[in-house]
């Protein structure tokens, strides 16, 4: 018991209102279940919904692509929308092995500051994307992201990590002979719940940062 107790799968049950016989005609073992939570607009340029980790990252990438559409970039850009990031980064492992990139950017979410949270460990909603700084990341790529943000006057925040990033970047960086990797993350509240909250301006500025980096496609 207690607030910190995490229920195991064997402790969970879903009351469907059906009898066992009726339910067996509808579902089978292994069927997935999710919360029927719509995307809800909020005040102050924010939205609430499920799976914004990492739908917001996909939105930022698509926005970045729209910004550079039709432009002649100084590099070849591949986009990977991978699965199972939360269960071992399996999609990222296969994708990076197949693409064999020279440089990889992982776009994800990170913890946004809320009531009672440590401001040292969290980003500020509305403060722009967070650029990862970690010993597992390429400092050259990190510096190039910072330079792109500063050149285009895009607000950004540092996300300092002492080890692994907890993102697909951890897989990218050790693919084959190693890949120079960076992270760009969107501040998000209530992570891994059906009511995650993001600020739209952070998503747009993440896309703007990615586009600015693509126009340079270089490391410092």
Regions found by a protein language model. Name each.
Residues 1-220:
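N-terminal hydrophobic/helix-forming segments and targeting peptides
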């Amino acid at each position: 018991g207690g607030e910190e107790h995490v229920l195991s799968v064997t402790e969970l049950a879903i009351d469907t209102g059906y009898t066992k016989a009726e339910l067996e005609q509808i579902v089978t073992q292994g069927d997935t279940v999710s919360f029927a939570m719509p995307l809800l607009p909020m005040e102050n340029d924010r939205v609430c919904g499920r799976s914004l980790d990492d739908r917001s990252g996909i939105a930022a990438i698509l926005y970045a692509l729209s910004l550079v559409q039709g432009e002649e970039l100084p590099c070849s850009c591949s986009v990977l929308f991978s699965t199972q990031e939360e269960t071992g980064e399996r999609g990222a492992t296969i994708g990076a092995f197949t693409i064999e990139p020279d440089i990889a950017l992982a776009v994800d979410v990170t913890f946004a500051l809320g009531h009672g949270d440590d401001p040292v460990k969290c980003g500020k909603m509305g403060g722009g994307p967070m650029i990862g700084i970690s010993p597992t990341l390429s400092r050259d790529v990190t510096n190039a992201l910072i330079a792109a943000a500063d050149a285009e006057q895009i607000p950004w925040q540092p996300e300092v990590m002492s080890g692994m990033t907890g993102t697909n970047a951890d897989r990218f960086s050790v693919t084959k002979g190693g890949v120079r990797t960076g992270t760009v993350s969107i501040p998000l509240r209530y992570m891994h719940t059906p009511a995650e909250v993001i600020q739209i301006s952070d998503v747009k500025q993440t896309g703007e940062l990615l586009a600015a980096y693509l126009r340079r496609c270089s490391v410092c």
